[in-house]
């Protein structure tokens, strides 16, 4: 926004504050009730605002040091947000690649390993599958194919941002 436009708007706001008035639309605006109750509109808004853009899952201080984590499902995707052993912020779908079970049930904590409660598959805080019991039953598998699915994540402005789609991107310049 140009400085001249900012000044014009600020002068208008100051005028209303000085005169104890508010800005109105010049009359009553009627909004159809289905604006607030329509499932179709809800789905459109949900997809537009919460699935197409990065969302805040916490503040930087919510992961105070290396090997700390938090979990959330704020926007329909179970997220495991971690700081790795070097303190870098990363995020993964909090879902075991084997059977789709939630890997970490605790909301917050500090650990370097996360184990799926279903079969005990264990992941490090880099999302890698590092172990699985009963190898005689599962056979040899390519661990690289069964890690936690990483989600686009960045730490900026004091917040932890995660995109709910693995194919999404986070770009604050747009």
Label each residue range with its predicted role:
Residues 18-22, 26, 34, 49, ...:
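Residue-level signal for well-ordered alpha-helical segments
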Residues 62-166, 170-173:
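Rieske [2Fe-2S] iron-sulfur-binding domain
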Residues 24-25, 29-74, 78-79:
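Non-catalytic accessory segments flanking enzyme active sites
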């Amino acid at each position: 926004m140009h400085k001249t436009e900012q000044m014009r708007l600020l002068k208008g706001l100051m005028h209303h504050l000085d005169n104890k008035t508010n800005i109105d639309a010049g009359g009553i605006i009627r909004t159809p009730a289905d604006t607030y109750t329509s499932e179709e509109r809800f789905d459109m808004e949900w997809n537009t605002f919460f699935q197409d853009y990065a969302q805040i899952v916490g503040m930087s201080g919510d992961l105070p040091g290396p090997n700390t984590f938090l979990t959330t499902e704020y926007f329909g995707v179970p997220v495991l947000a971690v700081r790795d052993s070097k303190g870098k912020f990363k995020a993964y779908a909090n879902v075991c690649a084997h059977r789709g079970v939630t890997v970490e049930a605790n909301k917050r904590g500090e650990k370097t390993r996360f184990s799926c409660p279903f079969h005990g598959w264990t992941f490090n805080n880099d999302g890698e599958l590092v172990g699985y019991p009963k190898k005689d039953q599962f056979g040899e598998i390519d661990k690289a194919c069964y890690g936690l699915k990483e989600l686009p994540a960045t730490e900026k402005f004091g917040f932890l941002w995660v995109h709910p789609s693995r194919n999404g991107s986070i770009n604050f310049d747009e």
